Amino acid sequence: MSEAVEKIRSHDKYRQFYELATKIRNQKLLADAESASLHRHKQEVADLEVKLLTEAWRSSYWTNVSRQLKSQSLDPSYACRLLKEISDTEALAAYKHFGHHYSTLNQLLTVLYMEPTSVAELLNMWDQNDVTTNDNLIQTFFHLVYSCGLYPDDELKIAQVVCYLLKLQLVKSGSQMRTMLRKETSISTRFYKYFVEQMHPTMVYLTKALRKSVLNVIQLGNFWLDVDMKQSSSRFLSDGRQNSERLPEYRALVVSKLVDFVDNFLENISLALSMLPPNLNWIVRDIFCSLYEIVDDMSAIELSHACKDMIVSNLLCPAIISPQKFGVVDNDVRIGSIVNHNLAQIAMIIQMISLREFESPPEEYREFLSQCRNTHLISEMMDSLLVENMAPDVEITSLIASGKSESDLETKSNFVGSLADANKLIKMIRETPPTTDLKISRIVSVCQKMPESFASTVEKLHVENSEDSPKLSALRNIHRKVQKSFKRTGDSFYDPNELHMKTENYGGVFEKENFDRKLREASEVERRKQEARKQKQLKETELLIMDNISSDSAPITIKASAATNAPIANNNFTENKDLIDFSTLYTTTDDVISIPSEPSKEEKSVEKPNVNNVSVDAPVEALQIGESRGGLAKLKNFSDRMKKGITQSNTLSDIRDHLRRSSSLAKQPSGMVSSASAQNIPDTEKGDSILAKYASNSSIKIEKSTFTKLTDTKSMPKNTEMSEPYYSPENLTSCRAFKDTLRKMITVLGNVSYLPKIGCRSEMKEMSKKVRLDSFLDGVLVETEHRREYGQAAQLREVKRCIELFENEGVEILMDHLVGNEVEQDFLVRQMREERAILMRKSNDISSMEQRVLLNRRLTEQILVDNLIQTFLETGFQNSKLASGKTPEVVAVGKFYSEFKFLQAHDERAEFLQNLLTYLRERLMQNYDWNFATESMIARAMTTMERFVMFAVYEIAFWPNREMDQKKDKLLQSVIGKASSSVTPVHEALKIPEHLLGEAPWPSAQAELSMLDNYVTAQEKLNCLVRCCDVINNLVALSSKNAVASADDLTPVLVFVIIKANPRSLLSNLQFIETFAGDQIESGRDAYYWVNFKSAVEYIKTIL
């Protein structure tokens, strides 16, 4: 049947028109869908980037609060309020705070971003060799200018600043290079510390290099490893159960274990060298190669060991001593004082190994250094970093950093920071002493255009209202209390205007300027100013003759004028595609992804010199900063092109100001105050420059063109198009009539959703293609008129009129070009699809970076809450001391310690612990500051409380029967250990399904289970078992497409994993979880895994 239908249709002479119209319509629908999807993805990517940078800003402030708590410069009773304010902060468009200074501040930040050497010079001049002051300066640059190094280009810029700053100060130190690095008070060493502690690639490298070795030390348990022989002997002899005659044997055991641990650390560090971040590798290598030729022989030796210190003493050893701080191990892992001591001893030995070529080690270390087998690995590692050929990634970094190659690294398109950050940055730059460096002088000159400080929204409200509102007064009272909590002199880390106020006073989004496109020659700037003045003078003339403008050009000018000057009545401003509502839009990167075809008209217009995007009064030198750079050439901000043509905003304050100006009030609107000096700031810019800065770029070009046509016809160049005939049969495909007809047919046929049915065909005479096309269009026209679609009907009549100009051969050529246009449209659709795929990948990358930021923030939150709870349990709330001088919390914890050991029944112990935790939670929440804590902070606080309380009574709770329980655990571990060497996944007693053997021996699950004994609380131990089972479940899913692990699959594999991992004290761990977490595993996933795990252990008992 289908063949018969196809045969009939093949003889239809109208078929070509039907198929062509259908294809054009399909292409139009597909192109519209792709365009809408592309626009949506661009907006989503822009919103995701702002969200990402805001989260990074919050995380940076959280880190600083944690640092101040640790240094005791912040009162713990105000910490939760600060964290709550930071967490509730949302970023707003910066121009709302800074007014007409926005573009200048934007220019300043972009110059600082593009000139890392100038930033290093500035930091070097500001260095006060004070840790607190330097850290505040570094943090401002770190999260405001470089966005915490999230994007690859940001990370490289930070690396360049660190490298150049270290070179400046190392050269100045001469033979004291290593001393400067070890003191860690100079701004270069502080910035390097920030770099290695905050950069995600560095944390990944440290995890790879140290995690296994650190876990081995943790699993050693409560065994002291002392380098000092006297201290080791003292610990041994203090135990009354030990015999002094066994002291040499004990000392040999200590030395043997320390040597084995050190060798294991060095081996893993060497194996992880390939994971060393390229930027860090480049910093050390560039410092060595740059300074080696300019220093004397003694300083060259000092330089070599200084570079070694940068890796070993300033990176590896701190991470070994504090593995949880660097994310090497989880914060839930039990690391007590003994483990901390042992890790410190190992780090000291490794440091001595790295220094032994330069200085003689102390006597107590020589015994260990002589027995270590892998001492050569450090020297080999440094030779690989400094002397051998660079890795490809390091070589690329070197080329980009030296300016020999353009950067193709992904970068951001916004700056996010607080008002305090901007004020601090401006203050420091304005106070920079005079210098002969032209770049720094230009940066200072840009900064001089702005006021000394900007006022916050709270201060602006205070200016507008003569009487303080009760709410505002309460905010200031809270602020005064918080400021008293900072126990240091100088500027507070938090600006007085940003604490305890509404969230709009925190975040600001600055769009990165593209200096390659926007900073042009001063002559071009002056020419644009003259054009603007001419347009103003001729405004009346254009209005008088507007009605006489031809229909081809008038709608463009009128539409732009109406769009620019129309009042805003509601919040539906963004529905107009020609306008952007900056109350909801931060930045839209229109050209983040470049299409390989020719740029659109809009893109070409943006690439022209644009005076409206920069300050008109900027000096020539400032306008030429970064002109030779191309790093931001891809950051063409859509909002930069559109915002200058918008003179209104739908915010309440802007509408109020517009009403005041329109009513000609003599008083200047107070809502426009944007600096600390209020209305007394002298405006150094002329009126024309301010108008030119915010004028619409597109409107200027349109008005200029229109006026030229209307008034200055003599000066116009001869129009070659008008001199040629509209329709030319001799030059058919190049004449304007052919191009117009082709364009109109594509437009009309692309909008037709229904095609006529021509049922009667005349066979009396042969019809030409032109006649058939006219008949086909008549059918479409009739259908359109019947549907009352008069606009489309008018377009169809225009198409029919244009076709009348052509002969039959011309119509056939026109049809051929329509078919050829199909190929071009397919190519454009493919380009849009490729661009959409790139945007989707970028969106995925941003989501990945956000997860990374949230992970770091969660680690910071855990460390911070742990410090707060430890203070709470050790000292309590100082304002609630009892007559004994102790707080109720301290008394309750002491009572728990003294009575817990007398309880024998498991239920009594569990209930006693739960009662204490309930009481401590109630006491904690009675503190006003903890009412501001988030749910995650409270949950972490309860976990920390339980861990802190149980740590002191852990052995009593874990082995209630002491020696009897320990013997059972050792016996089971011994039996499992013997079986472990002979058991394989195909052992007949295990009965593991054959389709699961491809993932054997499940090493990830074994590694997770081996951590069981390193946790303190029952819930943490249960979580460890759940993660082990989850790993097995995920591996089972790899065995087949739709594999879901049932109990029959999970239990045999779990038996094999338990035998191979052979965790310590397995029976006591199960009993401990049953006692103190039994009520929490009644149902759900945890209960399912818990039952399967106990079944696996019971089965092991039967088969061994």
Swiss-Prot record:
One of its GO terms (biological process) is endocytosis. One of its GO terms (molecular function) is GTPase activating protein binding. It is found in: Membrane; Cytoplasmic vesicle, Clathrin-coated vesicle. It comes from the Eukaryota. Residues 156-389 form the Ras-GAP domain. Residues 663-682 are annotated as: Disordered. Residues 966-1104 form the VPS9 domain. GO terms for cellular component: clathrin-coated vesicle; cytosol; endocytic vesicle; membrane. Gene3D superfamilies: GTPase Activation - p120gap, domain 1, VPS9 domain. Pfam families: RasGAP, VPS9. The record marks R182 as: Arginine finger. Keywords: Cytoplasmic vesicle, Endocytosis, GTPase activation, Guanine-nucleotide releasing factor, Membrane. SUPFAM superfamilies: GTPase activation domain, GAP (SSF48350), VPS9 domain (SSF109993). SMART domains: VPS9. It is a peripheral membrane protein. The keyword Membrane applies. Interacts with GDP-bound rab-5. Interacts with alpha-adaptin. Belongs to the GAPVD1 family. Acts both as a GTPase-activating protein (GAP) and a guanine nucleotide exchange factor (GEF), and participates in endocytosis. Acts by regulating the activation of rab-5 by exchanging bound GDP for free GTP at clathrin coated pits. This is Receptor-mediated endocytosis protein 6.
